[in-house]
Amino acid sequence: KKKGVAQQRVKISIPLPEEQWTLFFDDVDLGPEDVVGEVDEGFSILFDSLNPERIILAALCCGIGRFALNKGVAYASERNVFGQPIGAHQGVQHPMAKAHTAVEMASLMTRRAAWEFDNKLPAGASSNMAKYAAAEAGIEAVDAALQAHGGSGFTEDTGLYEMYPLVRLLRTAPVNRELCLSFIGEKVMGLPRSY
C-alpha cells in the first residue's frame, strides 16, 4: 500500500456478498513501476477490462428475469379465479410474454458478447448492448411476475420481491444505462461524443 492511499467501506442497503469501498489518493507519488498498460491509454484499457463484468452482469440479469418469470408463470397457471387460471387473461399473460421476449433477446446479445470476448474480438459494443438490454429485461420480468402474483408477490414465500432491489441496482451500477447508451451512440452509431 502506497503512502497517501486510504480506503473506506461504503455500506449499501442491498445484501450482497461483495463489499464496496471508496479509495482516497492524497499526494501519492507513483513511479514507472506503478504504470499499468500504456501512459495516456488508461481510459481505453479500463473500458476493455470492464467488458467481462458487463457480460457477467447481463447473464445475471437474464437469470433473475427467468427465475421471476418461472415463478410468475407457475402462479398464473395454478391460481384460479372465476373458474379459470389467471394466466388465461391477457392482462396477466401479455406482460409476462413481453418480459420473456425481452429476456431472451438480451440473452442472445449476452451470448454474442461472450463469444466475441472469448474469441478475442472487440466486445465493447455487444457488452454494452447486452448489459443495457438485460438490466431492462430483468426489471421488466420481476415487475411482471410481481404483478401476476398481486399482493402475494411481496411475501417472503415467493422470493420475488427480494430480486427487485438487486436487478434495479444492476440497471445503475457498476455502469448505468446512460453510459451504455452513450457508448452505443458514439462507438457503434458514430454519433458525437456525449460525455
Q: Can you describe what each PLM-predicted range is?
A:
Residues 1-74, 84, 179-180, 186-187, ...:
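FAD-binding core of flavoproteins
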Residues 137-145:
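Hydrophobic alpha-helical segments of membrane proteins
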Residues 149-195:
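Glycine-rich phosphate/cofactor-binding loops in nucleotide/flavin-utilizing enzymes
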Residues 73-87, 100-133, 146-154:
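C-terminal helix-coil-helix/basic helical segment that borders enzyme active sites and/or dimer interfaces
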Residues 46, 72, 113, 130, ...:
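Short alpha-helical scaffolding segments that buttress acidic/His motifs in well-ordered protein cores
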